């Protein structure tokens, strides 16, 4: 209590003299008195005695010249009264011990840098180069934090939601930095070749997302980039990732590794172009790997319900396709278009209806390629499976096939 009273009295005295209230109350305490009081067991802290005149100055690689007057810097505490070092001393000693030449960190540490330079100089150590990076902010321009923003800032979230590691790394690299040629898709090797601190901007990046919105749960640019990687990465890299996703969803068959490997790789190649995450292979792409799949209600409404005559026409189309030989994309296309011409309707009616019946979706790859991939037996069965529920007025329960 006496120590606190003494500090308060000295602070009031300094304030009366026009000194900064942050000034060290013991700054002018004679060394002999300080040593005697410490030897007598009085608690004490160790401070850095900052010069009153002059300034610290350094060239930040990103933010340029940084200056601060000594009068704006308090006599910072280096060691607490319990002997524990504070942050600024700890990081300086750590960097000296590891012979760090470049300190690269967030721009919220710019203020600390002036204090740390004083410690380097007091210890007679070489001052490293500093590069302070712009921050990544939330949509409201506040700092991102796990406490406030939860899963959206957790790497495991992106792993569990089907992000390709290389894609997410690429996305993060472009938050605050860009290459000279504005290229956006940058595999690791190219990132390493093109990256330079000179390419880092000074403006903070904003991580755009909408909380509690399943469509915009993360930044749209991150999803776009993930889709680009899924569409363009070498099959040898993508196929094992899809295998892991299907295995987790209990859709993997060992035949895909053996007799049906060529079919599996072809399926991945055909359907990957509209997917945004690896999860899409087991959700939107489920119909390719299982006969137990859901129908998208929008797809049913758009492609089936508007034309009640499809209840009769689709089984007839199935009968036509049973006779198609060979059962490939070109032959199926001829059969579908001929059938549409005979009924004097547009072929698109059957193309769209077939897509929903065979995959449960409203959009997807070339429908005739889908017919060929799924094969005659599954295609015919699925075209006929809609009859029992075509007249249903409710889709409150997922429609299954098989």
Question: Where would I find each of the regions flagged by the language model?
Answer:
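Glycine- and acidic
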Residues: 98-103, 153, 317, 335-337, ...
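Catalytic adenosine-cofactor/nucleotide-binding cores of aminoacyl-tRNA synthetases and other
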Residues: 126-295, 359-397
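Residue-level signal for well-ordered alpha-helical scaffold segments within enzymatic catalytic domains
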Residues: 118, 122, 170-174, 354
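C-terminal accessory/binding modules appended to enzymatic or scaffolding proteins
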Residues: 239, 305-358
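Active-site cores that bind ATP or allylic diphosphates and position pyrophosphate for catalysis
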Residues: 2-132, 137-146, 154, 179
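Short histidine-centered catalytic/ligand-binding loop motif
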Residues: 102-106, 157, 303, 320
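Conserved S/T- and glycine-rich ATP-binding loop of Class I adenylate-forming
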Residues: 48, 222, 354
């Amino acid at each position: 209590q006496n120590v606190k009273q003494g500090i308060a009295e000295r602070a009031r005295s300094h304030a009366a003299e026009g000194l900064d209230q942050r000034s060290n109350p013991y700054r002018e305490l004679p060394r002999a008195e300080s040593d005697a009081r410490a030897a007598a067991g009085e608690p004490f802290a160790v401070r850095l005695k900052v010069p009153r005149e002059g300034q610290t100055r350094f060239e930040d690689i990103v933010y340029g010249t940084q200056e601060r007057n000594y009068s704006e810097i308090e006599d910072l505490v280096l060691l607490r009264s319990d002997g524990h070092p504070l942050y600024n001393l700890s990081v300086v000693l750590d960097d000296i011990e590891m012979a760090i030449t470049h300190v690269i960190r967030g721009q919220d540490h710019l203020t600390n840098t002036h204090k740390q330079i004083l410690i380097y100089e007091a210890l007679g150590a070489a001052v490293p180069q500093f590069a302070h990076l712009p921050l990544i902010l939330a949509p409201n321009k506040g700092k991102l934090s796990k406490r406030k923003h939860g899963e959206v800032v957790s790497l495991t979230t992106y792993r569990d939601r089907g992000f390709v590691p290389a894609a997410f790394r690429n996305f993060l690299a472009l938050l605050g930095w860009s290459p000279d040629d504005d290229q956006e898709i940058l595999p690791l090797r190219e990132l390493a070749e093109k990256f330079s601190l000179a390419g880092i901007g000074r403006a903070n990046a904003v991580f755009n997302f909408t909380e509690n919105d399943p469509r915009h749960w993360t930044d749209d640019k991150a999803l776009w980039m993930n889709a680009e990687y899924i569409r363009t990465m070498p099959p040898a890299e993508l196929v094992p990732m899809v295998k892991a996703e299907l295995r987790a969803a209990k859709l993997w068959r060992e035949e895909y590794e053996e007799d049906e490997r060529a079919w599996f790789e072809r399926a991945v190649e055909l359907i990957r172009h509209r997917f945004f995450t690896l999860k899409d292979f087991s959700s939107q792409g489920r119909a390719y790997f299982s006969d137990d799949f859901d129908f998208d209600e929008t797809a049913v409404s758009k492609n089936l319900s508007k034309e009640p005559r499809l209840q009769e026409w689709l089984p007839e189309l199935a009968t036509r396709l049973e006779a198609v030989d060979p059962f490939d994309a070109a032959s199926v296309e001829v059969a579908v278009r001929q059938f549409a011409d005979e009924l004097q309707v547009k072929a698109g009616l059957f193309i769209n209806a077939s897509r929903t019946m065979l995959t449960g979706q409203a959009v997807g790859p070339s429908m005739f390629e889908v017919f060929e991939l799924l094969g005659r037996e599954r295609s015919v069965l699925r075209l006929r499976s809609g009859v029992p529920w075509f007249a249903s007025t409710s889709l409150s329960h997922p429609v299954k096939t098989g």
